[in-house]
Amino acid sequence: ITLVIKIISTNNNELSNDIVRGTNRQNIVMEEAFEGTRQFHKNFEQFVNNVVADFSDKEKIYYERRSKQYSDNPNIKQYQKFNLHNLAQFYVAAILQKPHKAHLHESYLIKNYKTSMFLDNHSQLPYFAVAYTFLTLERLIREHFITKYFIKYKAHLLMIYFRLLGGKQIDMNNERSADKYADKVLKTTYNLEAAKKTFEQCIEIF
């Protein structure tokens, strides 16, 4: 039996991804599985790291762009991490204002909202606002400030939260306007007591 093996070595990530895509066309590998390797997400990971650089260790958050990316670092707790799945879900809920769609698999969300999400011309601050607010909401549920009943309605609470603080609609095609919107959300979210009061309002509205 003759077995032919081809070894391809490259430092070009885009080329590597193209090769893997081509090789796996015959396998059940969704195009969306490569989303996290796009430059947008690499840039966003660095953006998150830059924003939280001066935060206390407890308040820092981390974008786990690759599966188990931070598993070898015991100083980073699970509750400080968010992934592509979380980001896609709650961006659809908070920014696109479609919380009823947020429970769907990220492959569906990425495919169906590809013209509205993870675009290279988008400001990264609104994505950070989504992630930080999501993890803050998780914390409030974990610490029993918000009852577990609302676990299944997190997407709805996040949408209401963003609308209360930022306004009815965000223009992601206008960087200055989008950043202003995100800053309004983050100004409250950075203050845990203020975030609690706002989520109380969200629950009353809900």
Model regions and ranges:
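A sequence-level detector for short glycine-anchored, His/Arg-bearing signature motifs
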Residues: 1
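C-terminal accessory/interaction regions of large nucleic acid-associated machines
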Residues: 155-206
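Conserved segment of the helicase C-terminal RecA-like domain
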Residues: 4-5
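C-terminal catalytic or substrate-handling cores of phosphate/nucleotide-
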Residues: 9-172
